[in-house]
Amino acid sequence: MTKPIVFSGAQPSGELTIGNYMGALRQWVNMQDDYHCIYCIVDQHAITVRQDAQKLRKATLDTLALYLACGIDPEKSTIFVQSHVPEHAQLGWALNCYTYFGELSRMTQFKDKSARYAENINAGLFGYPVLMAADILLYQTNLVPVGEDQKQHLELSRDIAQRFNALYGEIFKVPEPFIPKSGARVMSLLEPTKKMSKSDDNRNNVIGLLEDPKSVVKKIKRAVTDSDEPPVVRYDVQNKAGVSNLLDILSAVTGQSIPELEKQFEGKMYGHLKGEVADAVSGMLTELQERYHRFRNDEAFLQQVMKDGAEKASVHASRTLKAVYEAIGFVAKP
């Protein structure tokens, strides 16, 4: 029986955080045995906002090395760079012609990004969800791991696939959202009611995977808890968001359950909790960074991973694009 196909992509812009790792990357690693996983570094999406060319190239290789350091295995999964497989852009253009202006106008992420990048509201930013649909539909994807911010885009991908299939027959699989069984939702350190984000302007809210572990310890020790007197280490997201966030992080790193941790810190001060979280996270990052630097310093290996991944991806992508071109009436290339 063939494994279900899972597709996920991440931009090479901005450093990945422990939130990305605990909430997504670790789940990707665990999925590799049960699913046919396709992981894409979406550099074409990245240029919808202005990029420095040199920094973008570096960030792409950094992201690839980080994926490998986190445990994505190129022997088990297909991992590649979006611009290395031209079928993404080719299908994206075709799907533009089956997507309505009104649908794209309603995308909340376009509205948010337009407000943030008012000096560069470009057509690529507007059509971003169509290219995302092409990314997914090219591989006859069954499942797409999505966060809250991408749910609307996946719904559009499903609508486009169903619209196209209604016209031309079953060309595309209609993808379903995939919600992993577990995955910590890591919140901002100083504003624990909002999710930790790699694009947060206040870097004290964020722990990057490549950050100096000593700096991480300082940030965690400054993290928000609460003013209860005496202090009570208890999991209560509603009333003790900061303490709950620290417990979530510690549980994700150590594997201990929340009730076990509550018992462990019974009668202890918040400083004890912060110290344990700081030690656990800095230890995890030290090991991860050692693996990262090993991969990042071997550029020949990274080039080979990208080449092999693009070749594997192209086999699937070209098959789908051929079916699409035939359906819409393009003359086959001699």
Curated annotation (Swiss-Prot):
Motif interval(s): 'KMSKS' region: 195-199
GO molecular function: ATP binding; tryptophan-tRNA ligase activity
Pfam families in the cross-refs: tRNA-synt_1b (PF00579)
Xref: InterPro entries: aa-tRNA-synth_I_CS, aa-tRNA-synth_Ic, Rossmann-like_a/b/a_fold, Trp-tRNA-ligase, Trp-tRNA-ligase_bac-type, Trp-tRNA_synthetase
Record bears the keyword Transport: no
EC number: 6.1.1.2
Residues that coordinate or bind ATP: Q11, P12, S13, G19, N20, G147, E148, D149, V186, K195, M196, S197, K198, S199
GO cellular component assignments: cytosol
Motif, 'HIGH' region: chain positions: 12-20
Catalysis: reaction(s): tRNA(Trp) + L-tryptophan + ATP = L-tryptophyl-tRNA(Trp) + AMP + diphosphate + H(+)
Keyword flag Cytoplasm: yes
A GO biological-process term: tryptophanyl-tRNA aminoacylation
Subcellular location(s) of the protein: Cytoplasm
Domain of life of the native organism: Bacteria
Binding of L-tryptophan, residues: D135
Keywords: Aminoacyl-tRNA synthetase, ATP-binding, Cytoplasm, Ligase, Nucleotide-binding, Protein biosynthesis
Purpose of the protein: Catalyzes the attachment of tryptophan to tRNA(Trp).
Assembly description: Homodimer.
Protein family according to the UniProt entry: Belongs to the class-I aminoacyl-tRNA synthetase family.
The protein, known as: Tryptophan--tRNA ligase
